[in-house]
Amino acid sequence: MRFSRILTVFLFCILCFSCTGKNSGRTVDGRNVPRSRPELQNPGKEQQLTIGFSIATATFIIERWNKDLKVFTGAAKELGADVIVQLSAGGVKEQISQINYMINQNIGILVVIAHDTELIAGAIRQVKEAGIPVVAYDRLIQGVPLDAYISFDSREVGRQFGRALMDAVPKGKYLVVNGSVHDVNSFDISEGLHEIIDPSIQNGNVQLVREIWLEEWSSDEALEKIDAVFQDTTDFDAIACGNDAIAGAAIQLLSERRLAGKIAVVGQDADLSACQRIVEGTQLMTVYKPIGKIGVRAAELAVALGLKARGDNSIEIPLPDKTLENHSGTMVPSYLEKSTAIFKYNIDEVIRDGFHSRDDVFRNVK
């Protein structure tokens, strides 16, 4: 209960920060954003499009999702839409309950970061039956037709993990700590990683000592499971982690054993702490995802789909980058942004984009 109250207050502060004042059409959360497209503008409050945004709370406590929400809500308001945000602290059951609540709030479109990409399918089917379009944000919901999916190429993220580790440790012992088993992205990342490292496993240059999976995207769970591995052995040369929170857990445990910086560790999301670890020399690489781009693109897509579903035939839906299968019998129009591998030598990329400030990144470096 206390955790839910803290999240509620935190969310309120974020929304106030991102949505106060008149929007200039120039920046959202310090990032360059195109001015509102006239064809997406709503004519008045009584006809205003309402977007429902359902976020699995377990993901919201991860740093990058705070940025996604601020950019998305700011861009949606630039386009004349209102956004109802619901955080599901109780897992998939609460997320389903909150989705049903938003249906009754007359939302024109639903955007979902799913807690469980399979168990949520029934609720999404009800949304579709109500005539409401659905966009899966970052996590491709399985088993039900979707109007769109927007994310980054998770297989490419896995390949970026693999390339970074193979360049740094072409021969050695590897540990792989995958993300949540409830998130299809975890499996895509794993497939991309193995695409790169498996040839070296097969020829004997790389020994995959352990590969483990987490139930949730949880740094606490990662600490527990990685510690259990380290109780058996710390004889590793490289560790691939599903995200930066997991990488942080691994590096914390390595630090306790005076091994931080001696083992190559990679993650994703370009969390501030990860960028700090990179310049400090304890993390090799993080995968940076330009949240400003995906947040704005998602807002534009959601508004276009919502207005189109409401009967505005003048709206043109942007062409997808590709279509993906989600075991629903239909292909999902998918909008995928590119990610960048960030090392110490190119850390300025996250600074130039305004993702983090130079002072923050180099705070612990003298």
Model-derived segments and spans:
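Hydrophobic alpha-helical
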Residues: 111-128, 193, 215-277
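Bacterial N-terminal signal peptides that target proteins for export
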Residues: 1-7
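Flexible loop/hinge segments that line or gate small-molecule binding clefts
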Residues: 117-156, 166-167, 173-179, 271-277, ...
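An alpha-beta-alpha
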Residues: 57, 69-72, 83, 160-203, ...
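Hinge/beta->alpha junction and helix N-cap segments in small-molecule ligand-binding domains
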Residues: 54-70, 85-94, 116, 139, ...
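Hinge/cleft segment of the Venus flytrap/periplasmic-binding protein
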Residues: 20, 25-49, 184-185, 196-200, ...
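Exported/periplasmic ABC-transporter solute-binding proteins
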Residues: 34-35, 237-241, 251-324, 331, ...
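C-terminal motif of bacterial Sec signal peptides marking the signal peptidase cleavage site
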Residues: 15-18
